[in-house]
Amino acid sequence: MSNSAKSVVILAAGKGTRMYSQLPKVLHKLAGKSMVQHVIDTAKSLGAQQTHLVYGHGGELMKETLGSQPVNWVLQAEQLGTGHAMQQAAPFFADDEDILMLYGDVPLITKETLERLIAVKPAGGIGLLTVILDNPMGYGRIVRENGDVVGIVEQKDASEEQLKIKEINTGILVANGGDLKRWLAKLDNNNAQKEYYITDIIALAHQEGRKIETAHPTRHSEMEGVNNRLQLAALERIYQTEQAERLLLEGVMLLDPARFDLRGTLTHGKDVVIDTNVIIEGEVTLGNNVEIGTGCVLKNCVIGDGSIISPYTVIEDANLAQECTVGPFARLRPGAQLADKAHVGNFVEMKKASLGVGSKAGHLTYLGDTEVGANVNIGAGTITCNYDGANKFKTIIGDDVFIGSDTQLVAPVCVANGATIGAGTTLTKDVNENELVISRVKQTHISGWKRPVKKKQ
């Protein structure tokens, strides 16, 4: 923010009755993050020195959910309008700082639009964010005289002539703290709703001869609020469309932009291809020439250059080096690490496990608390038995090891370089280099065996 605009107020006390939810309205998520968190993050991006969060309904849950956020919690015990909400925060305003007012249920407002608003605010006056709508129904109208803003009239209080005005108030404004405190003290509730409107300060400022300058958002969606789940879903689609368009323009190939969800941050290289119905959560990095198959979910992971993730794979808190292949239907859980050219096939699950250079776990395998060296083959049905019901134990497999199908490795256990484990083995002791270990039951042949025959009832 500019040197004079140091604090932000976020109004977030509403119950959200039309959401039909026990969750406070502003905690409902858009793109995997609560609406109010979007606004808090925008305030941070402006460099706000202090953020005042006005809360009411569901206060304990609000604090539990957002407790780690560096905000000043301001209680609005009764919801008596936006002006009343600002009155609760006013004691925290410094006279010589500018105050930017935002809303916890208007999540798509951008840093760029707010910087424009702050820039137009005149000394001693108000910067007001407005927008022109073909259908302004339901919004407060901007009243001008000779081009100057002189007031705002709410829909329910507007005259027939005022209802024809298409310039509407978004509710977002910036003003000096000392001026705000003076104007807020003069508000009354002499209106149809019997509420204290923050918009009434516009007329008060005009009466003092103060200038009100306006700015407009880059996109209309920036000023759209949420009162019900239908509106939230609509904003979700708008947000996802904007993210998809941005990624396409940056060179990411989304095979169907309408079927892609970004619920975090995606950092990408060149020639990345993402198929349909992929969900990105948290912080995800995709290297050059990465391919992501349909239906994959990627969360807080790094995928190296040239790696291919086949359909319906879930990767969370994992790191993949270059030219890895994973899936389809694989699951890499937190702590999974794949070295260059490692392969994880269908129905393989890894947790706190690493796979060395060129190693393969092709199918139907669980690797937990396991270190696997280079050029290892893990046969189908291999299980590392890492949990005894109380504690976890580690399995270590060296380089150039062959693990036969249907092997159970009962941790803690180590398999040294070059060892071979025969199919069907239950391994309970360490294996030396280049040893062959087989523990299956001796095969028995019985000639002329006759199967039992069911008795007829």
UniProtKB/Swiss-Prot annotation:
Keywords: Acyltransferase, Cell shape, Cell wall biogenesis/degradation, Cytoplasm, Magnesium, Metal-binding, Multifunctional enzyme, Nucleotidyltransferase, Peptidoglycan synthesis, Repeat, Transferase
The keyword Magnesium is annotated on this UniProt entry: yes
Subcellular location: Cytoplasm
Record-linked InterPro entries: Bifunctional_GlmU, GlmU-like, GlmU_C_LbH, Hexapep, Hexapep_transf_CS, MobA-like_NTP_Trfase, Nucleotide-diphossugar_trans, Trimer_LpxA-like_sf
Key word Transmembrane helix present: no
Recorded superkingdom: Bacteria
BP terms from Gene Ontology: cell morphogenesis; cell wall organization; lipid A biosynthetic process; peptidoglycan biosynthetic process; regulation of cell shape; UDP-N-acetylglucosamine biosynthetic process
Major site of localization recorded for this protein: cytoplasm
Cofactor: how bound: Binds 1 Mg(2+) ion per subunit.
PROSITE patterns, A to Z: HEXAPEP_TRANSFERASES (PS00101)
Residues that bind acetyl-CoA: 380, 386-387, 405, 423, 440
Pfam short name (any one): NTP_transf_3
Pathway(s) of this molecule: Nucleotide-sugar biosynthesis; UDP-N-acetyl-alpha-D-glucosamine biosynthesis; N-acetyl-alpha-D-glucosamine 1-phosphate from alpha-D-glucosamine 6-phosphate (route II): step 2/2; Nucleotide-sugar biosynthesis; UDP-N-acetyl-alpha-D-glucosamine biosynthesis; UDP-N-acetyl-alpha-D-glucosamine from N-acetyl-alpha-D-glucosamine 1-phosphate: step 1/1; Bacterial outer membrane biogenesis; LPS lipid A biosynthesis
Active site (UniProt): 363
Catalytic activity: alpha-D-glucosamine 1-phosphate + acetyl-CoA = N-acetyl-alpha-D-glucosamine 1-phosphate + CoA + H(+); N-acetyl-alpha-D-glucosamine 1-phosphate + UTP + H(+) = UDP-N-acetyl-alpha-D-glucosamine + diphosphate
Region spans: Pyrophosphorylase: 1-229
N-acetyltransferase: annotated span: 251-457
Membrane-crossing segments per the record: none
Residues that bind UDP-N-acetyl-alpha-D-glucosamine: 11-14, 25, 76, 81-82, 103-105, 140, 154, 169, 227, 333, 351, 366, 377
Enzyme nomenclature, EC number: 2.7.7.23, 2.3.1.157
GO molecular function, one term: glucosamine-1-phosphate N-acetyltransferase activity
The protein's required cofactors: Mg(2+)
PANTHER family, per database record: BIFUNCTIONAL PROTEIN GLMU, NUCLEOTIDYL TRANSFERASE
Described function: Catalyzes the last two sequential reactions in the de novo biosynthetic pathway for UDP-N-acetylglucosamine (UDP-GlcNAc). The C-terminal domain catalyzes the transfer of acetyl group from acetyl coenzyme A to glucosamine-1-phosphate (GlcN-1-P) to produce N-acetylglucosamine-1-phosphate (GlcNAc-1-P), which is converted into UDP-GlcNAc by the transfer of uridine 5-monophosphate (from uridine 5-triphosphate), a reaction catalyzed by the N-terminal domain.
Family: In the N-terminal section; belongs to the N-acetylglucosamine-1-phosphate uridyltransferase family.
Protein name, UniProt field: Bifunctional protein GlmU
UniProt source species: Proteus mirabilis (strain HI4320)
